[in-house]
From Swiss-Prot:
It comes from the Bacteria. The keyword Cell cycle does not apply. It comes from Halalkalibacterium halodurans (strain ATCC BAA-125 / DSM 18197 / FERM 7344 / JCM 9153 / C-125). This is Large ribosomal subunit protein bL31B. One of its GO terms (molecular function) is structural constituent of ribosome. It holds the Pfam family Ribosomal_L31. Gene3D superfamilies: Ribosomal protein L31. Keywords: Ribonucleoprotein, Ribosomal protein.
Length: 81
């Protein structure tokens, strides 16, 4: 890699704000907030709104969209049977 053109890649802690779940990962993202991790080191803290701990795909609490309601409204709008 060419020196001086790539951002610094370092360890950061990501925190899911909806569940409080935290995980340590590598990233180029930076933050003014820091947190002390389980290993005793201090890392930058990145707050995210959704992660694998709260996303419906990973939690199994998926909500299926009801397409039948849209079809019924279309039929009613155009007087179809």
């Amino acid at each position: 890699m060419k020196p001086g053109i790539h951002p610094d890649y370092k360890k950061v802690v990501f925190m899911d704000t909806s569940t409080g779940f935290k995980f340590l990962s590598g990233s180029t993202k930076t933050s003014n907030e820091t947190i002390e991790w389980e290993d005793g080191n201090t890392y930058p803290l990145i707050k995210v709104e959704i992660s694998s701990d709260s996303h419906p795909f990973y939690t199994g609490k998926q909500k299926l969209a009801d397409a039948g309601g849209r079809v019924d409204r279309f039929k009613k709008k155009y007087n179809l049977k």
